[in-house]
Every structure is written in structure tokens, then in C-alpha cells.
Amino acid sequence: MNIKRPFILISNDDGYHANGIKTLVSFLKDHADVLVCAPEAARSGFSCAFSAATPLRLKRRHNMGDVEVWSCNGTPVDCVKLALSELCGHRKPDLVLGGINHGDNSTVNNHYSGTMGVAREGCMKYIPSVAFSTCNYDDEADLSYLRDDVCRIVERVLADGLPKGVCLNVNFPAQPPFMGVKVCRMTFGSWINEVVKARHPHGYDYYWMAGECRNDEPDAEDTDQWALNHGYIAITPTRIDITDYAFIDTIKSWSL
């Protein structure tokens, strides 16, 4: 590795083989020392889960050009933990990136997302961290049109850093041209019609998690979902500390 170049750790929740992570590596490999450690298979929806009772394995995969690639049988967070402990050596990454995720992580999906789990884990290790996602759900889509925007965000975070305990959730509309960038808050919403019930031929019920994410404030123009719906790149600063400070005094008044 060239210590004069930034060192970037990349993971995701779609798996080391996914088009999105390969695209992200291709954007950055000529400008930084990049290391990939990602799940061996898709781990969408794993958020910040880690493996407390399952032994983990690291497996070396084929390089992406000159970029070293490892997979792990665990979660996205497991990948970050193992990479920092076992693969990075004595060099701490300058940046942790998650993505590029096939599917947006706006609104409450922020909480479920394994891609955001990558960024949160990096953030909790005091490393500037960013999660990238696109509303384009096509696993084989050509995402090269994201290059300039991704690189500009990465360069700015490398130059200026991020506040302690803050990571970025970046979501792109499905297709260009983009209207610009909106720095915005997370949309409040909820998943509805989530459970699909079916009957197995062997005589028992089984269930699929499905449904749709409902936007509960569709007219609020300061939200990530509004930005995406109107063609803007949505950047949401996300805090690790989820304390509701405004409500602390109210709870104290309960005399519990």
C-alpha cells in the first residue's frame, strides 16, 4: 500500500460479488488504496447485527484489479469488524464506505439497512463513514453515471472529515439527469402490508416478508424521500447517538 494515498475500506450488504460494490471499487481504486471485505452472500436488512454465537470465516477472493477482496460468512458489521481487526494491519482506514446498494435506504429503511450498518460500524470506530445507495433496483445496471458524484462526496469527506458520531446516508435517484443535491432529514414512514401468508403442501403455514414503505409526510420538502422523488441526490447526516434530548426533562418529571 502507498501510505501517501488514502486508505478506504469498502463493504456492503449485497455480497462481495455484487455489481454495486464492484462499481464503487472501480471509481476509487486509482485514487486510493482500497480493501474490500463483504458478505459471502446477500445480507440485506441485517442493519447493525453481528454474529455473537456463530464462528466466522474469512475467505480470500479474486482481486478486483489490484484491490484485495475478502468475503465473510457473517453480517456486514462482522465484515467491518474483521477487516479492522485482521486485514488492515497497523494502518487504520481513512474512510469506511458501504455500497453501492441496489435499492434506496431512505426513510425508515435507514434503520434496517445493512449498508447503513457498515457506515455506522465505521463511525463507531471513529472513522469517517458513508453509505451509498441507489433507487435503481436492477442488480446488473450500469451505475457508471454515479462516478462524478460519488468521487466528489468521497473527496470532500476525506478532506474535511465528519463530526464524531456522524455518518452520511447518500441516496441516488434511479436514473440521471439529477436535479442537484439536497441535504435533508430522514422521512418519517412505516412499512405496511408486510406479511404474505401461504399454505405449504405439507400442511403448515409459512410467510414472506414483503409489503411497501409508506411515506407518512409526502408533502414535506425537507426530506430524503421528497428529494429522491423529485430527482435530487439525498444526503442525510445520521447520528449514532439516538437520544431524544428534548424529552429527557419530561421523563425526569415522571418521578419514576
Question: Model features per residue range: what roles?
Answer:
Residues S144-L256:
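Electrostatically charged, flexible surface regions
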Residues V118-G122:
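Hydrophobic/aromatic ligand-binding patch that stacks against planar heteroaromatic rings
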Residues C123-Y145:
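Glycine-rich phosphate/pyrophosphate-binding loops
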Residues D14-T23, P201:
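Short acidic, Gly/Ser-rich segments with clustered Asp/Glu that frequently serve as metal-coordination loops
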Residues N2-I8, N19-E86, H90-R91:
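A cross-family phosphate/adenosyl-ligand binding-site feature
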Residues D94-L95:
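Conserved acidic residues
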Residues I10-H17, N109-N110:
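Short, glycine-rich nucleotide/cofactor-binding loops
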